[in-house]
């Protein structure tokens, strides 16, 4: 049922994604990000445009086009979105299992011309992450693989996908409740990424802490400190939690921060917000989204961004 709901949401997103891609010429701290945890070795800012291939479901597929827009605005002219494998409600293994004659992700990785592979599992374990990582490193030892956290569908943590609430009130949970709810999910992802890096013998996989940035934004909304957003529901199109433009922008900023290891703070209003025809989604909101994304990346020990890095 979850996959069916997400496929429905994916169709809803498809037209918006197409417009964004066309327009961009596409060719509060949770326990899981605690400062007390060991931080993996970060590197400095990435100055060269990255060639990015993405695989994901509808909580991720909007990222490539928006990221291209942001990179261009940041003066990164040689950023390239190489392709997108989009499957509604998918686990990473489903992208791996696409037949070789149609598998654009494998084709791109085998060329050795991919700098960053972005993945977005639903829940773990997901053997597709390891399979893609090994193939990617075989053809480009310097590739980085990012694994995107998400915000829990239906605001519940259920790896069986059997629990389906009759109604979902996204405005109901407090920030503390959201952090507690997401804690095992975040911990599971961090443990999985660390174990894969150990298996691979290098830090090749990095976490994009989008889920934690979303909690921080929801906390700001609850406190009345999010310009242009009155309720938590303003972030979502439906009960599952498909993203409206402000949430899409936040997630893309998280990817920008992790991929380029530099702050998005100060970038102009992205097309995804500018073309939404909502005057409340302005530069003040944009600045907040940038700050939250950067803060999440800086404080996550697996993002690859140096702790204490300045905006």
Label the predicted regions.
Residues 35-50:
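N-terminal low-complexity, Pro/Thr/Ser-rich intrinsically disordered segments
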Residues 13-27:
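Bacterial N-terminal signal peptides
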Residues 50-55, 59-142, 299:
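Conserved SGNH/GDSL esterase-like catalytic core that processes O-acyl groups on lipids
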Residues 106-248, 257-259, 266:
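Alpha-helical cap/lid subdomain in secreted, periplasmic
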Residues 1-10:
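N-terminal secretory signal peptides that target proteins for export/translocation
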Residues 28, 32-34:
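Boundary at the C-terminal end of the N-terminal hydrophobic targeting segment
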